[in-house]
Structures are given as C-alpha cells and as structure tokens.
C-alpha cells in the first residue's frame, strides 16, 4: 500500500437519541457521533411498526361521495 494516501482509521463513539452507545471504527475525523435511530429503537428491528388502516377512510369517502360518481 502507498503511504500517506489512506485516511486515518480509528475508533468512533456513537450515541443514539434513545441513549444507546456503541463504538465502531471509521475514517471520520470526529471521535463522537450522534445518530437519531439505531437498531434498538428503529421500528423495523423492534417490531413496533405502525400499520395505517385506510379501510375506514375509504368507507367514509364512499359513504360521503359514493352517489356522486354512479351513472
């Protein structure tokens, strides 16, 4: 490898908004890095995904405006 062309690869402390902290290696110049979502609080990994129920909205729309579009 050529000397002096590669970035400095060092340990970075990552802090999530949920309070989770972990260390990883990166070429970032910062020693500390803040993130908003990690695997402990992301809905995909926690299984707390919100499913939007649009069925009630469609029924409400059809009840309100259904007669306008019938021929």
Curated annotation (Swiss-Prot):
Q: Which cofactor does it need?
A: Zn(2+)
Can you name this protein? Large ribosomal subunit protein bL31
Has keyword Metal-binding? yes
- Listed Pfam families: Ribosomal_L31
Question: One GO CC term of this entry?
Answer: ribonucleoprotein complex
The protein's superkingdom reads Bacteria
Describe the subunit structure: Part of the 50S ribosomal subunit.
Q: Which UniProt keywords apply?
A: Metal-binding, Ribonucleoprotein, Ribosomal protein, RNA-binding, rRNA-binding, Zinc
What's the stated role of this polypeptide?
Binds the 23S rRNA.
* Keyword flag Ribonucleoprotein: yes
